[in-house]
C-alpha cells in the first residue's frame, strides 16, 4: 500500500485503540469496524469468532464453527439468516465461500468474495441469500489467535455493481495486521479463548467492570445487585476464565502467566 495519508490514518487508529480503557472493549471493537469501513467505503461490518471443535478430516469446515458475531449495524433477517446457516452446516449443505475460508485457517489473510469462489457461485441460492439482505460483496480479514481460535473482520458492500477493489483489500489487510494484541483481547472479552462457552451479555458486563479499579461494592451498585451477589458472580466468572483472582484476570488480559 503506497498511500501515505491512509497509512497515517491507520497508525492513528492503532494509537486510538491503544488509548481506550480495557473495560471499553466493545466500544473499541465498534470504533475499529466503523473506521476501517469508512476507509474502504463499506456500508456495514461485523466481527465473528470461530473455534475449531474437531480436527476430523471428513468435516468440510475442518472442524471450525462460528461462536459469536457482532454487527456494526443490524442487518435484515440477522437471526433467521444465522439460524438457517447453522442448520445448513449441520445438514451438510455448506456455502462454498465458508468452506474456502475454513481451509485458509491458520494464516493471516484478507480476501474478497471473488477471490475465493468461482463465477458460478454467484448464481447459487447462497449468493441470493446475501442479496436478500442487501449485501452485494464482502471483504474478510481472517486473524488466527491460536491453533484453535480465529477472529474474522468482515466488511460489506451494500451497493450493486461496485465490488471491493484491490486497494481496499490492501487497506483492510494493513489496518488489521498491526493489532495482534487487540484481536486477542476482543476474544478474551467474549470469553472465547479460555471459557468452554462464550460469555453471556451479563458476564461480559461484569468482566468489563472487573477490568476497572472499582471495588465489588461499586460494581454491585452498577449492576443493581447486592455485594454478596456480585461476589458470587465474580467467583463464577473467574472460575470460568480459569483464573483465581483479579490479578490473575489482569495477567490473562495482558497475555502473561498468572
Positions of PLM-derived features:
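Short alpha-helical "packing" element that flanks the helix-turn-helix/winged-helix DNA-binding module
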Residues: 203-210, 249
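Allosteric cytosolic regulatory segments
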Residues: 172-180
